[in-house]
């Protein structure tokens, strides 16, 4: 009976440790995604650049970095 109790305690500790490690991994993934979000927001929401078919004189003025003649074009 003592061996069974010890075995159950060890199993409970291992399961709780595994659950804690999974939770930390999931939080790390969430942090990774949240770090990427501002760069996308800066590019499209904060504007500061001209969208597709807007007038431009240089590549740097376009959100796509592609000024063709006098308007912003797609990336390719």
Curated annotation (Swiss-Prot):
It comes from the Eukaryota. Pfam families: Conotoxin (PF02950). The keyword Secreted applies. Disulfide bonds join 49-63, 56-67, 62-72. GO terms for cellular component: extracellular region. Keywords: Cleavage on pair of basic residues, Disulfide bond, Ion channel impairing toxin, Knottin, Secreted, Signal, Toxin. It is found in: Secreted. Residues 1-19 form the signal peptide. Residues 20-41 form a propeptide. InterPro entries: Conotoxin. One of its GO terms (molecular function) is toxin activity. The keyword Signal applies. Expressed by the venom duct. Inhibits voltage-gated ion channels. The presence of a 'disulfide through disulfide knot' structurally defines this protein as a knottin. The cysteine framework is VI/VII (C-C-CC-C-C). Belongs to the conotoxin O2 superfamily. This is Conotoxin Vc6.9.
């Amino acid at each position: 009976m003592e061996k069974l109790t010890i075995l159950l305690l060890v199993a409970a500790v291992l399961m709780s440790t595994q659950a804690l490690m999974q939770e930390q991994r999931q939080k790390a993934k969430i942090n990774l995604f949240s770090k990427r979000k501002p760069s996308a927001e800066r590019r499209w929401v904060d504007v500061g650049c001209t969208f597709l078919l807007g007038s431009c004189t240089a590549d740097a003025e376009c959100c796509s970095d592609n000024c063709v003649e006098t308007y912003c074009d797609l990336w390719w």
